[in-house]
């Protein structure tokens, strides 16, 4: 995992910008989650906001490790905008087929194989969820709304 050395400087200059590059394995995902959440400590997120962010980031990053074979590096970006965090998970692995499942359609728990629960959680807990593949790069982006925390 390689945190962006300039991220702290950009945060001090106005706005929040975190960038973490990690290898596609579950231990690196855990470390990246810790680094990302530690980097947001100064926002004093509520327990609910922090938990929601952690679940969505964990699902997104773990989905890349599980499903995007030969993903190479994974890049996590978090930018603060007003009362929200804009997040992006970028990789060059195997693209997802079709659109992520809609939040209004929960997966069938009795269907064999992958159930799509991770995508359903992401859609349920985040806003403005978008997935695109361009020039061999996959990008999942989403927004996490914040209550009292305001980013300047």
Question: What annotation goes with each model-predicted range?
Answer:
Residues 34-58, 111-113:
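Conserved short strand/loop->alpha-helix "switch" segment adjacent to the catalytic nucleotide/phosphoryl-transfer site
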Residues 86-114:
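Glycine-rich/acidic phosphate-handling loop/turn and adjacent ATP-lid/helix
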Residues 68-72:
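A short, flexible helix-to-loop-to-beta junction within the catalytic ATP-binding CA
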Residues 73-83:
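Short beta-strand/loop element within the Bergerat-fold HATPase_c
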Residues 111-126:
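Glycine-rich phosphate-binding loop
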Residues 58-59, 63, 124:
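Conserved polar catalytic motif of the HATPase_c/GHKL fold
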Residues 1-20, 24, 123-152:
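Flexible, glycine-/charge-rich segments associated with ATP-binding catalytic modules
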